[in-house]
């Protein structure tokens, strides 16, 4: 009887690991030839291509992450030298090239721009995406590098989707010279977001998939999916935050906007783009989008 019980427990744990491992490999593991995770095929718009490279002087930057990964970023310089810096952070399954249209707008207005490839994306090393849990530490290090290069820098963080979650968590770490944050369609937590979308997007039930995936993610990456939780730290941010969300977002539920906004204690503004889906606020109305962003950032000039 005891042997049967032990065997049953082993089978149960093996099954739980297999379930969690399937999700982590499907949703978080980088594909072959630097491609995004397999799950991106279920989420990403296949017609969306990287915008043109901004027509401004550019150079490659690199740094080593706290856990030994070589990370890459593209640094663009405006026409006139100044102390204003924008770190633009891409979303899930993308790389820094997808932020080049945002970079163009900042550069035209005289900002220095740094566009990182987050870990496990683009030219940066890494096997797994962690939905902002570790990426936020990497962006913190990019901000630290900027401050070392330019001690008088005024740095803003602007992120979209997973990039938005990342910049919120980065801001809570209080990088030196941080001036403001723009978050566009960020989630309260990756765990909550995946749970809400699991059946619709991946055809999987929340239970037992998410609890098992949380454990396997911890084993494989050192952090849990639930560690990517901006809602838990947004009240620690001390600089002004602009919260942006499209009211037709089907991926990151629209109600997450108010949860984040209400929890924030720093000076804050909210910008809802009617009719915009996920990560589509800028494309829906570019003029209104960037007018709002740069009016908000006037205090960092």
Q: What does each model-identified segment do?
A:
Residues 262-279:
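Catalytic histidine neighborhood in serine/cysteine hydrolases
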Residues 169-223:
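Hydrolase active-site cap/lid region
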Residues 4-64, 74:
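An N-terminal hydrophobic leader/cap segment in hydrolases
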Residues 102, 230, 239, 253-262:
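Short alpha-helix in the alpha/beta-hydrolase fold that links the catalytic acid
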């Amino acid at each position: 009887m005891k042997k049967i019980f032990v065997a049953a427990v082993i089978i149960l744990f093996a099954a739980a690991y297999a379930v969690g491992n399937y999700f982590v490999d499907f949703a978080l593991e980088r594909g072959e030839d630097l491609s995004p995770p397999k799950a991106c095929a279920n989420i990403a718009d296949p017609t969306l291509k990287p915008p043109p490279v901004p027509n401004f002087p550019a150079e490659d930057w690199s740094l080593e992450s706290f856990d030994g990964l070589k990370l890459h970023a593209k640094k663009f310089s405006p026409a006139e030298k100044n102390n204003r810096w924008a770190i633009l952070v891409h979303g899930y399954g993308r790389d820094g090239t997808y932020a080049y249209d945002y970079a163009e707008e900042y550069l035209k207005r005289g900002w220095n721009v740094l566009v990182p490839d987050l870990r496990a994306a683009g030219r940066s090393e890494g096997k797994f995406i962690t939905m902002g849990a570790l990426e936020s530490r990497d962006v913190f290090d990019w901000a630290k590098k900027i401050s070392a290069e330019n001690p008088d820098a005024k740095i803003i963080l602007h992120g979209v989707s997973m990039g938005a979650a990342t910049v919120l968590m980065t801001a809570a770490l209080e990088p030196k010279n941080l001036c403001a944050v723009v978050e566009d369609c960020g989630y309260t937590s990756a765990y909550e977001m995946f749970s809400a979308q699991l059946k619709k997007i991946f055809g999987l039930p929340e239970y037992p998939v998410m609890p098992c995936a949380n454990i396997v993610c911890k084993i494989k990456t050192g952090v849990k999916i639930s560690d990517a939780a901006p809602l838990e730290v947004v009240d620690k941010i001390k600089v002004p935050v602009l919260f942006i969300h499209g009211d037709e977002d089907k991926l990151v539920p629209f109600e997450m906007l108010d949860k984040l906004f209400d929890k924030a204690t720093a000076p804050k503004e909210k910008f809802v783009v009617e009719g915009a889906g996920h990560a589509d606020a800028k494309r829906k109305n570019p003029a209104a989008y960037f007018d709002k962003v740069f009016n908000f950032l006037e205090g960092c000039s």
